[in-house]
Regions:
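Short, hydrophobic-biased segments on the C-terminal half of alpha helices
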Residues: 41-45
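The C-terminal cap of the DNA-recognition helix in HTH/winged-HTH DNA-binding domains
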Residues: 16, 31, 48-49, 95
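Hydrophobic residues on short alpha-helical segments
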Residues: 7-14
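Short, cationic-aromatic polyanion-contact patches
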Residues: 3-6, 58-77
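A short, conserved structural fragment
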Residues: 48-58
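Short acidic, hydrophobic short linear motifs in intrinsically disordered regions
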Residues: 19-29
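Amphipathic alpha-helical dimerization/coiled-coil segments
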Residues: 75-117
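Short helix-coil-helix linker/hinge
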Residues: 3-6, 19, 83
Length: 119
């Protein structure tokens, strides 16, 4: 499951404002993206068909949270680009990016928390 750049901006509008009426969505898309009503409804239908959002009785809600969506995107990236190996992904990431001490501590805390759940 992947969103293009424009679809991602559109999805963010919904996630940040849901539940919202389709009329409110049209207004927000005009203000933030300069989209016409027809463009908003076209993209909404496309993302509803993909099971990300739902437009029922003029009320737009998400069928998957932003966090769930990001998790699925991360899993897809690791599976496709790193043959499902999280350590390979982390090694590639840290070879190109310097981690701060806070980030290292946060990652270590996540690992320690996961180890505690396994027992």
């Amino acid at each position: 499951m992947k969103l293009g750049n424009i679809e991602s901006k559109f999805a963010d509008i919904i996630w940040e404002n849901e539940p919202l009426s389709s009329r409110e969505l049209v207004q927000l898309c005009w203000e933030q993206l300069k989209w016409k009503k027809s463009t908003t409804y076209t993209v909404l239908k496309k993302l509803c068909d993909r099971g990300i959002f739902k437009n029922e009785d003029g009320i737009v809600i998400s069928m998957i949270s932003r966090e769930e969506f990001n998790t699925k995107q991360g899993e897809h990236l690791i599976n496709e680009s790193f043959k499902g190996s999280l350590p390979s992904f982390i090694a590639a990431f840290i070879s190109q990016n310097k981690l701060s001490e806070d980030e290292i501590e946060e990652i270590q805390s996540l690992i320690n928390s996961y180890k505690g759940k396994e027992k």
